[in-house]
Amino acid sequence: AALKEQLPLMRYYWTSPADIEQALASGELVATSAWNSSYAALKREGLDVRYTSPKEGAMTWVCGFCLMSDHDPAKLDRIYDYLDAYASVESGVFALTEYGYGHGNINAFAKVEQDSPGLLKELGYSVDVNETLNAGIFQAPMGNEPALQAMFEEVKAGM
């Protein structure tokens, strides 16, 4: 019921980052929920965009890599090379500065703060990983996800 009540307040549900970036840049939208990369892209374009800081904390997520049990053993060295490259400070600096995405290498945060003082704070991060992690609300698996997804699709369709 709450989603249906909010539907008149919505301009539309976006389907790609380009949708919201163009709508924000043109002034069609004044606020949205978006991935960090849209914020970073719009800042690079010189637009005056800002993060909101919900009193409850920002929704956050973490992700990682895994080695599948059916991986090709002949490619194991290449797999580890990729993982090592991704885990590097340089990769973390790129993820933070270009996309606004966090990274698993804490030294990347320190390097960004050293090279671009204040950027981490602007992106909603801290050099202190515990402070960053404690500031967010981590999503948890939902047992009724299919039913919620079906309901959301109905609301988007205007039902």
Regions found by a protein language model. Give the residues of each.
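C-terminal capping/gating helix-and-loop segments adjacent to ligand/active sites or protein-protein/ligand interfaces
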Residues: 93-159
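Soluble non-cytosolic domains of exported or imported proteins
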Residues: 14-18, 73, 77, 89, ...
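A short alpha-helix capping/helix-coil boundary motif
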Residues: 17-20, 61, 127-129
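Ligand-binding pocket segment of bilobal, Venus flytrap-like solute-binding proteins
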Residues: 1-54
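A bilobed periplasmic-binding-protein/Venus flytrap-type ligand-binding module shared by bacterial periplasmic
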Residues: 62-75, 94-98
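Short, surface-exposed loop/turn microsegments at beta-strand edges and helix-strand junctions
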Residues: 55-60
